[in-house]
Amino acid sequence: MDYLNEDLQSVHDKLVAGDLTASQLVTDTLETIKTKEQQVDAFLTIDEKGAQEAAAKIDAQPIDADNLLAGMPIGIKDNLLTDGVTTTAASKMLANFKPVFDATVVEKLKAKKAIMIGKTNLDEFAMGSSTETSAFKKTKNPWDLDKVPGGSSGGSAAAVAAGEVVAALGTDTGGSIRQPAAFNGIVGIKPTYGRVSRWGAIAFASSLDQVGVFSRTVADNATVLQAISGHDEKDSTSADYEVPDFRAALNGDIKGMKIAVAKEYMAEGVEPAVKAQIETAIETFKSLGATVEEVSLPHSQYAVQTYYIIASSEASSNLSRFDGIRYGYRSPEAKTLEDVYVKSRSEGFGDEVKRRIMLGTFALSSGFYDAYFKKAGQMRTLIIQDFEKVFEDYDLVVGPTTPTTAFKLGDKGTDPVTMYMNDILTIPANMAGLPAMSVPAGLVDGMPVGLQIIGKAFDEESVYRAGYAFEQATEFNKNVPSFKGGQA
């Protein structure tokens, strides 16, 4: 089963009609993955046995005609815990780690009878923007195999873009769903902070991390997000809000919607060709009956600096649990207790993770806490207030998801600051905890451009409504990758 020209509804119809069984679907999907992985390298682990067993159970009963996820193979980012299936966070530190329980989001998908087909590649501990910091492999962009798929959820994005799976889960701390979605020409949403449980997600920066969804269409995205959303008492940051019917918002009507374009998001750092695509997208919204006006989010220019202080500080705390004692990698060279700590962490973590731990530890140290971490917290408040002011008068904020299209493998790996700036347009929504989605907005020199749609807290419905209307008007989601370049 190649999903390039399929969606949840089309595959579901075949299952309901009896033209396809869940077992056949899994077998076909595994064949597709086996073929395309030679080019893309999106997966770290394929759970062939588990997927076939789950499919057999589904085939033992009639398919529920009202459950679009029944029997659907889904990719899971490898920083989400999966019971009995290796979960590595793409780090040598967790190379052989097998969890004994599922993350809440995985549990919820299984309750909907979705099938976990495998674990997708990512930047180590989700720290990166290209999936090049993975300890195990470098995922390629299906549109050009010489280019990055983005990150940190590059494996999930590439798997969906390549047609290996119909949907996949990712996590987004500073743009790790939206940026790869833009680079791969697919739909990716980071929901409101607290909308989806983080229980069982390996923590990077706990005040920023959020689990979200990749898909080829807005409708599929809404279906999967519906399934994984909701309060979870195991996660203290999970919001006890009723989950609306996201698909009900997909009516294609945005007449009367007030949409803001932040002038800071269209500044000189955005490539002219990318900016032109977004300007065309803005005209599309106007033609659909929305009011579009320019606004200012003045403190967004400080978002990257603020983010790297806060995220690195939280990471240095979260990753202190990997010490060679309880679980994870332990250096075979360690002779003393101090050796266990120092050598296990030095050998188990990659360069980018160590860089961020050091940065965070520095920002939290007693002599520099007020100068860095405290100030970053204050700037975060100002960024939140900017959005609150705009949302008093507008329903949504739109702009480019990324300043450029996908860059070449190896191009930015030696310059961390250049890599960090790649998330300049996605970070503000994480700082404010707002829902934000990237939808395909056309091509520049054969590579996808993403349109970012940011909504008010817990108003994913408006984000989906606008995204769906844009998708229906443009049909950019029907573009398929060329698989050019690389060794293919």
Swiss-Prot record:
Family from the record: Belongs to the amidase family. GatA subfamily.
Enzyme class: ligase
A GO term, aspect molecular function: glutaminyl-tRNA synthase (glutamine-hydrolyzing) activity
EC number: 6.3.5.7
Role summary: Allows the formation of correctly charged Gln-tRNA(Gln) through the transamidation of misacylated Glu-tRNA(Gln) in organisms which lack glutaminyl-tRNA synthetase. The reaction takes place in the presence of glutamine and ATP through an activated gamma-phospho-Glu-tRNA(Gln).
GO annotation, biological process: translation
Keyword Iron-sulfur (UniProt): no
Keywords recorded for this protein, A-Z: ATP-binding, Ligase, Nucleotide-binding, Protein biosynthesis
A cellular-component GO term for this protein: glutamyl-tRNA(Gln) amidotransferase complex
Keyword Isomerase belongs to the record: no
Reactions mediated catalytically: L-glutamyl-tRNA(Gln) + L-glutamine + ATP + H2O = L-glutaminyl-tRNA(Gln) + L-glutamate + ADP + phosphate + H(+)
Protein name: Glutamyl-tRNA(Gln) amidotransferase subunit A
Active-site residues per Swiss-Prot or TrEMBL entry: K77 (charge relay system), S152 (charge relay system), S176 (acyl-ester intermediate)
Pfam families (UniProt xref): Amidase
SUPFAM superfamilies associated with the record: Amidase signature (AS) enzymes (SSF75304)
Superkingdom assignment: Bacteria
PANTHER family: GLUTAMYL-TRNA(GLN) AMIDOTRANSFERASE SUBUNIT A (PTHR11895:SF151), TRANSAMIDASE (PTHR11895)
Quaternary structure annotation from Swiss-Prot or TrEMBL: Heterotrimer of A, B and C subunits.
